[in-house]
């Protein structure tokens, strides 16, 4: 047997051998390409789609099935040579494509229908494949009907039209007419129809061909065949759903007769030519293919996998479900196409990756990628449009998602390259933000007033106050009771302020789809992107990706800084103590002239250090997704990558669940370590507890032992710093003995008289004396500020300030004087501070003066020094 496609001659294929082995998928594909006259690996099968048909034939052995197919379709199936033997010729199943080139009339001309079909075949459309199945009731198989049943089920799963080859003289008989084969066909098709997903449109055409018909009237034979079919149908066991159904529910029954092949050859050929029109001439009244495509809806490029899957299920004696097989085929084919397209897109993106590694940056990268993604999706839809729509849509969505992942990976590599430059520009700003927040914290911490014993008794618990009273009884010094609630509120405010400030820096990098705000941001972000500014401005997805990388990097940088501060907690809070001790709240350097001033500021400085220790206990910043909702018109025209990245924007917030709000140090006094929050549930790193109301162990920077150790070292360092300050104060005291002035007047009388008698020298001496007098008065005023009554000091300050304002209003300052004054009184905290611009809140005690504390000692060294100062006047008296 041979098959032709546009005149090309090809050998047929042994689809199923006599041992029941199906031709491999690759072999079936190779045959189909050859039958279509196309080279392997092209899209010929895909172009055919479902516009093809399959015709199969079943019947008894040696009943002339192959001969009938050769005459009808021009195939070259092997036929039996009666002169040599009688027996089995077709073993298993053979497949071939219909060849109408050799089908000509007696005059040698091809009939009109065949000519039309030839033109159709030449146009690569509506191919017709013919399957010749092994005959039944053969001596070779004996009583084994399992293979017969398997072939019947396979034929019903693939053939649009199933020819039943039957001798006319056997009509009315059971065994001779091979009615057992019909019973098998009915049963297996009933098995197929039993599935819920089976549709009534998927019933094959059962065409009964009565061979060697010599009578004139055909109606009697057709009625007899129908009665035989009905009797078989009534005797088989049917499912409940088909109890009252007829055979027409499962089959479209058609009948035809043909004259004797040998005795009436001319009539046989004539009737065969007419019969052939049933298969290709759509204008024929008996045309069999009412739909343009294969009735199972399996595309030709999926037929190899479909046949393999069906035959495997049949051979394993499993329940064959054609819709399920089509679903499996659709899924397999869609996954195959998806894999191919994904590989092509990955190779496409790898070219840009290589260019990036060479330092070449491509403009409009996302637009190029989006265009290729659209092309790939159209290609996928084109190759899978004939399969089940729900599976195609699902796989297409999966493909689009995976293509987006590959695209985002490439955009991420570009963003990572550019974000390294952006981080260099932002590093100073981020460090300044953290420094500004710490300065604000210490500024507010030293303004928190201490509680009196009564206030502490009213605000604290019984256990806490009993502890304070025991401390008071054990020490003769005053106890500075820390306002625990206010300190913890300040710690929380510090983290909120830091989050807002960092978020303000990061938001400059994100796209703003409002044109008004976009123009305002362009000038601010130009310096951040440096030479990549124009590249980023033209690609919103790249800008979003850069912002994501920078957000994560800023978060990691700040977290590492606080982790480093926590590792050296004692040194960190001691530096804060020194900063508060040595600088005024306006940032100017503080000089101490008396020990009383040092005594007054030391508790505030120690409290500021302890508040900072509370900030180092737990890292309260976390990154969450900022679910920004944009209008459709705002995101119209954006790429998939940009829209996806919009949904993953980062936002820095403060950790403040119910347990984290309780996870603060408990302050009692400045002379004892803060109590650790032991009762809070802490989630382990690998814990299965996914509750939100827990404390994250990864964010706990200080353990209970670390807090105690840091406090002990902090106390020692503060004592040492106080000793250095006391030595500095003592070194500045240079009082001359009382007898020095009279001796100077006595010995220098002549020089004094000479100066008084000389006007020039007198003026010079007066000027020098005025300068020294001014310095002396300023020094005495500083001492008075430190030791005098607060009400008097504040009153004098107000009067002096009013006099200065009046003087400035009457006598304008020169430009040089203005510059020098600004330089002299510049506040170190007034430099570019992101926290000041990003957050408009302030601490309630920020405007208040430092609390005036009663003169008392806070350390052993300072106590001894004060006692020594009090004993000196007594000894002189």
Curated annotation (Swiss-Prot):
Organism lineage: Eukaryota, Discoba, Euglenozoa, Kinetoplastea, Metakinetoplastina
UniProt source species: Trypanosoma cruzi (strain CL Brener)
Cellular localization per UniProt: Endoplasmic reticulum membrane
Domain of life from the UniProt record: Eukaryota
PROSITE patterns: G_GB1_RHD3
Broad EC category: hydrolase
Family indicated by similarity: Belongs to the TRAFAC class dynamin-like GTPase superfamily. GB1/RHD3 GTPase family. RHD3 subfamily.
Function (record text): Probable GTP-binding protein that may be involved in cell development.
Chain segments annotated as coiled-coil in the UniProt record: 388-410
Transmembrane segment boundaries: 736-756, 760-780
Entry-linked CDD domains: GBP
Name the record gives this protein: Protein SEY1 homolog
Extent of Basic and acidic residues compositional bias: 867-877
The GB1/RHD3-type G domain, residue ranges: 49-307
Enzyme Commission code: 3.6.5.-
Record GO cellular component, one term: endoplasmic reticulum membrane
Residues binding GTP, per UniProt: 59-66
Region (Disordered): 850-877
GO biological process: endoplasmic reticulum membrane fusion
GO molecular function, a single term: GTP binding
Cytoplasmic-side positions: 1-735, 781-877
InterPro entries in the cross-refs: G_GB1_RHD3_dom, P-loop_NTPase, RHD3/Sey1, Sey1/RHD3-like_3HB
Stretches assigned to the Lumenal side: 757-759
Keywords: Coiled coil, Endoplasmic reticulum, GTP-binding, Hydrolase, Membrane, Nucleotide-binding, Transmembrane, Transmembrane helix
Membrane topology: Multi-pass membrane protein
């Amino acid at each position: 047997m041979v098959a032709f496609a546009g005149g090309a001659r090809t050998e047929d294929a042994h689809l199923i051998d006599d041992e029941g082995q199906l031709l491999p998928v690759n072999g079936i594909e190779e045959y189909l390409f050859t039958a279509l006259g196309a080279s392997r690996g092209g899209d010929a099968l895909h172009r055919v789609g479902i516009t093809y048909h399959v015709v199969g034939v079943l019947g008894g052995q040696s009943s002339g099935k192959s001969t009938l197919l050769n005459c009808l379709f021009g195939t070259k199936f092997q036929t039996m040579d009666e002169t040599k033997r009688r027996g089995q010729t077709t073993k298993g199943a053979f497949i071939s494509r219909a060849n109408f080139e050799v089908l000509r009339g007696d005059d040698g001309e091809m009939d009109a229908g065949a000519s039309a079909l030839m033109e159709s075949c030449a146009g690569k459309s509506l191919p017709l494949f013919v399957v010749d199945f092994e005959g039944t009731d053969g001596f070779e198989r004996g009583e084994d009907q399992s293979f017969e049943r398997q072939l019947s089920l396979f034929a019903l799963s693939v053939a649009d039209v199933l020819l039943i080859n039957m001798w006319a003289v056997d009509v009315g008989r059971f065994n001779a007419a091979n009615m057992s084969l019909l019973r098998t066909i009915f049963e297996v098709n009933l098995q197929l129809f039993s599935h819920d997903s089976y549709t009534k449109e998927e019933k094959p055409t059962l065409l009964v061909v009565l061979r060697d018909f010599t009578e004139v009237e055909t109606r009697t034979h057709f009625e007899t065949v129908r009665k035989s079919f009905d009797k078989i149908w009534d005797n088989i066991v049917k499912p409940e759903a088909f109890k009252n159904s007829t055979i027409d529910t499962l089959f479209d029954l058609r009948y035809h007769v043909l004259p004797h092949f040998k005795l009436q050859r001319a009539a046989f050929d004539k009737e065969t030519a007419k019969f052939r029109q049933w298969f290709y001439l759509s204008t024929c009244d008996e045309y069999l293919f009412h739909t343009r495509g294969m009735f199972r809806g399996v595309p030709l490029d999926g037929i190899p996998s479909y046949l393999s899957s069906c035959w495997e299920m049949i051979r394993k004696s499993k329940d064959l479900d054609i819709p399920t097989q089509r679903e499996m085929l659709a899924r397999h084919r869609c996954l195959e196409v998806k894999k191919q397209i994904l590989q092509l897109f990955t190779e496409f993106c790898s070219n840009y990756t290589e260019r990036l590694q060479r330092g070449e940056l491509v403009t409009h990268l996302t637009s190029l990628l989006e265009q290729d993604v659209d092309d790939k999706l159209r290609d996928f839809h084109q190759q899978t449009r004939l399969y089940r729509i729900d599976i195609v849509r699902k796989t297409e969505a999966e493909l689009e998602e995976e293509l987006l992942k590959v695209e985002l990976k490439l955009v991420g590599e570009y963003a990572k390259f550019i974000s390294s430059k952006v981080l260099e520009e932002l590093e100073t700003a981020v460090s300044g933000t953290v420094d500004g927040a710490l300065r604000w914290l210490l500024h507010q911490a030293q303004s928190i007033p201490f509680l009196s014993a009564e206030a502490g008794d009213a605000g604290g618990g019984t256990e806490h106050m009993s502890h304070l009273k025991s401390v008071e009884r054990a020490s003769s010094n005053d106890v500075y009771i820390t306002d625990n609630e206010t300190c913890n509120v300040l710690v929380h405010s510090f983290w909120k302020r830091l989050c807002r400030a960092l978020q303000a820096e990061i938001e400059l990098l994100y796209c703003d789809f409002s044109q008004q705000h976009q123009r305002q941001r362009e000038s601010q972000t130009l310096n951040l992107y440096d030479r990549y500014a124009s590249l980023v401005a033209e690609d919103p997805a790249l800008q979003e990706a850069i912002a994501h990388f920078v957000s994560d990097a800023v978060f990691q940088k700040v977290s590492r800084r606080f982790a480093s501060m926590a590792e050296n907690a004692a040194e960190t809070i001691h530096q804060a103590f020194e900063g508060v001790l040595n600088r005024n709240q306006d940032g100017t350097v503080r000089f101490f002239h008396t020990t009383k001033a040092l005594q007054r500021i030391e508790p505030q400085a120690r409290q500021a250090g302890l508040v900072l220790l509370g900030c180092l206990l737990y890292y309260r910043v976390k990154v969450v997704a900022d679910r920004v909702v944009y209008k459709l018109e705002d995101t119209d025209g954006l790429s998939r990558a940009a829209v996806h990245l919009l949904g993953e924007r980062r936002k820095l917030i403060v950790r403040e669940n119910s347990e984290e709000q309780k996870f603060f140090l408990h302050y009692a006094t400045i002379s004892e370590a803060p109590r650790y929050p032991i009762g809070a549930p802490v989630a382990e790193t690998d814990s299965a507890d996914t509750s939100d109301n827990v404390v994250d162990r990864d964010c706990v920077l200080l353990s209970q032992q670390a807090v105690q150790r840091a406090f002990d070292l902090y106390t020692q360092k503060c004592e040492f710093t106080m000793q250095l300050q006391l030595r500095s104060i003592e070194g500045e005291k240079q009082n001359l003995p009382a007898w020095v002035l009279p001796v100077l007047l006595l010995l220098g009388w002549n020089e004094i008289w000479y100066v008084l008698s000389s006007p020039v020298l007198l003026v010079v001496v007066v000027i020098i004396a005025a300068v020294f007098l001014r310095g002396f008065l300023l020094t005495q005023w500083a001492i008075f500020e430190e030791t005098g009554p607060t009400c008097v000091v504040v009153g004098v300050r107000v009067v002096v300030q009013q006099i200065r304002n009046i003087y400035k209003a009457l006598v304008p300052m020169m430009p040089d004087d203005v510059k020098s004054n600004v330089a002299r009184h510049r506040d170190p905290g007034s430099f570019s501070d992101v926290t000041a611009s990003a957050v408009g809140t302030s601490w309630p005690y920020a405007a208040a003066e430092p609390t005036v504390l009663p003169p008392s000692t806070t350390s052993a060294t300072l106590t001894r020094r004060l006692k020594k100062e009090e004993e000196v006047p007594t000894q002189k008296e």
